[in-house]
Amino acid sequence: MKNIIPKDTRYIPFTQQNSCCVPTSINIVMYKEGLPLIPQELLGYYLGLILEKKYKKLFWDVRTGKRPPAGYGTQMQKKQFEINSIFKKLKIPLKVTPYPIKYFKNKKELVLFIFDKIKRNKNLIVLLASDVLNKTKNNNGHACVIDRIYPAKDLIRLIDPSAVQPKWREIKIDKFIKAIKSHPTGQGRILELTRIK
């Protein structure tokens, strides 16, 4: 029988609402961890979600305004939207540990880090430049869940919440690294989400 989805996937993909890649990626992890889900729009709001005015009608209530440097979406880099504080506020039993791309000395170190985390069934979300993944010129940040890494094949598989991209995306590791380094605000990083008791 043909594989309809990857046999070794660790996640059930979800599809994002406009500009909600971060909260949707978090919900993908929450579902895997057996945690109660909350609407991506609500989680996004608390993480500083801001939209272009023309998309306001897609939401019950949302901030609109000037386009931030990384594009429309969440604003976790601002103190009032810091992810661990928001998780506490919303009683989400997860803790985020960020790993900026500069944390890794080279490709080998990054690959070993991801490989080890996946081997131990840890949850990783990557913040990167969508332009590198999608061959566009929109200057937007994007978030995906890291599903698997295959060092021998030089591939990494992401769960992409975008409505217009494949849910399971395999890309070359060098392209993955370039996408992280090319994040529009230099905030490209890997977030490890750990369940807290």
Language-model segments: residues:
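Noncatalytic regulatory segments and standalone regulatory/sensor domains
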Residues: 18, 95, 119, 137-140, ...
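Predominantly the structural core of cysteine protease catalytic domains
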Residues: 66-143, 147-149, 194
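Solvent-exposed loop/turn segments at secondary-structure junctions
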Residues: 28, 130-133, 163-165
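Residues that form generic nucleotide/phosphate-binding pockets
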Residues: 46, 50, 86, 117, ...
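Active-site-adjacent structural segments surrounding the nucleophilic cysteine of cysteine proteases
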Residues: 1-81, 137, 152, 196
